């Protein structure tokens, strides 16, 4: 890649450090008109570095001078005279440093777009409908709920995606979410966790509650529970939230029967949901799903919205969500536990589970009332 410098420019090397421009010009001007004599000097000491460039007006004169003077002695030292070439280092030095930053730059951009952009970008698309339910949570709910449930294959990509996007963010955003929205609820969970190992695991993480949010609108808690559990907890989440998801399926069938769903929900929602319900949680839109059945202190209004959301996943689930999105506390749920009959009637399996529901509502209501 050595290219000749401008025609008529000669490189003179091996100079005596005492030789100066004037001496060079005196020697070379014999062969033709010299346009420029450039003696390379050390910047600090200003002494000759032993080479120079002499430019002739006519390239032919330069060739003659190079032919005649190459190897001749000047000031006691043989000099090397040849057609000057553009210094090879200058090309890389000019081109190189910029390219390395540039090359570094795009990767950063790509990394950014790959990590943040694509995964985050896709998420917004998926996030589309759910955001109504309350801001941040949908990020998770949307992919996890509909997508996860609809396509089992999606699990791996989503989890990977979430890892790509979520692994660090889990540490950052989620804690913040947990702090912002869930701190009371977290305490509620962890505390309840201890005496309610079952629901504690399910609701234990803000992510769970977050995951529960939009689904009322998203299609079904079942889809949602499984997916979120898979996302958040991997294998344990599966079993845990299988605890939840299983409860979901249990919720579906048993809720209709009015039996064990009430059981699981009570043992589950009330003991745990009651304390958390008191705090800020309702204002947390995403948690509305959690509020839907959990924050309701009685756990029955919650199940109301839950059962009806079962019946109409969209209508009452969304109503409840809307109410809590607007920040109105579930007045009925929170203010005073509903009467026993509201509980039994609330569940679809009213007649069958009525007696059991009533007594349980007593027990659950008392517990939720503290």
Curated annotation (Swiss-Prot):
Look up the record and report any one GO term of the cellular component aspect: nucleus
Q: What is its main location?
A: nucleus
Disulfide bond positions: none
Q: Where is the composition biased (Pro residues)?
A: 127-140
Bias-annotated ranges (Low complexity):
87-110, 303-316
**Residue stretches making up the RRM domain:** 8-86
**One GO process term, biological-process aspect:** protein homooligomerization
Q: Keywords assigned by UniProt? A: Developmental protein, mRNA processing, mRNA splicing, Nucleus, Ribonucleoprotein, RNA-binding, Spliceosome, Transcription
Q: Where is this region: Disordered?
A: 69-370
Q: Signal peptide: which range, if any? A: none
Write down the superkingdom of origin.
Eukaryota
- InterPro entries found in the cross-reference section: Nucleotide-bd_a/b_plait_sf (IPR012677), RBD_domain_sf (IPR035979), RBM (IPR050441), RBM1CTR (IPR012604), RRM_dom (IPR000504), RRM_dom_euk (IPR003954)
Q: Which Gene3D superfamilies match?
A: 3.30.70.330
Q: Which GO terms describe its molecular function?
A: chromatin binding; mRNA binding; RNA binding; RNA polymerase II cis-regulatory region sequence-specific DNA binding
Annotated compartments: Nucleus
State where composition is biased (Basic and acidic residues): 69-80, 158-196, 219-254, 317-326, 359-370
Report the protein's function. Answer: RNA-binding protein that plays several role in the regulation of pre- and post-transcriptional processes. Implicated in tissue-specific regulation of gene transcription and alternative splicing of pre-mRNAs. Associates with chromatin. Associates with nascent mRNAs transcribed by RNA polymerase II. Component of the supraspliceosome complex that regulates pre-mRNA alternative splice site selection. Binds non-specifically to pre-mRNAs. Required for embryonic development, in particular of the brain.
PANTHER family named in the record: TRANSFORMER-2 SEX-DETERMINING PROTEIN-RELATED
Please identify the protein, giving its name as recorded.
RNA-binding motif protein, X chromosome
Species for this entry? Xenopus laevis (African clawed frog)
């Amino acid at each position: 890649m050595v290219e000749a410098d401008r025609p008529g420019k000669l490189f003179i090397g091996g100079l005596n450090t005492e030789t100066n421009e004037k001496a060079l010009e005196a020697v070379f001007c014999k062969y033709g008109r010299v346009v420029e004599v450039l003696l390379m000097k050390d910047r600090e000491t200003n002494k000759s570095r032993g080479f120079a460039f002499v430019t002739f007006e006519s390239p032919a004169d330069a060739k003659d001078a190079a032919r005649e003077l190459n190897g001749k002695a000047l000031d006691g030292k043989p000099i090397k005279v040849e057609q000057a070439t553009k210094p090879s280092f200058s090309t890389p030095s000019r081109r190189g440093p910029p390219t390395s930053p540039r090359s570094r730059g795009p990767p950063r951009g790509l990394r950014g777009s790959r990590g943040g952009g694509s995964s985050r970008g896709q998420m917004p698309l998926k996030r589309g409908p759910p955001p109504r339910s309350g801001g941040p949570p949908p990020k998770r709910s949307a992919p996890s709920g509909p997508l996860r449930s609809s396509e089992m294959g999606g699990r791996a990509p989503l989890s990977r995606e979430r890892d790509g996007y979520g692994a660090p963010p889990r540490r950052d955003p989620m804690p913040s979410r947990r702090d912002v929205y869930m701190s009371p609820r977290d305490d509620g969970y962890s505390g309840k966790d201890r005496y309610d190992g079952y629901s504690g695991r399910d609701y234990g993480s803000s992510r769970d509650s977050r995951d529960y949010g939009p689904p009322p609108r998203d299609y079904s808690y079942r889809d949602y529970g499984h997916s979120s559990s898979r996302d958040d907890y991997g294998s344990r989440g599966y079993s845990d939230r299988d605890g939840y998801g299983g409860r979901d399926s249990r919720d579906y069938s048993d809720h209709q029967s009015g039996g064990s769903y009430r059981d699981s929900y009570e043992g589950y929602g009330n003991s745990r949901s009651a304390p958390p319900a008191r705090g800020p949680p309702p204002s947390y839109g995403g948690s509305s799903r959690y509020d839907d059945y959990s924050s309701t202190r009685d756990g029955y209004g919650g199940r109301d919205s839950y059962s009806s959301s079962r019946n109409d996943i969209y209508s009452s689930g969304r109503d409840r969500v809307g109410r809590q999105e607007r920040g109105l506390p579930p007045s009925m749920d929170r203010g005073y536990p509903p009467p026993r009959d509201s509980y039994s009637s609330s569940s679809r399996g009213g007649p069958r589970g009525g007696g059991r529901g009533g007594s349980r509502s007593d027990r659950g209501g008392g517990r939720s009332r503290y």
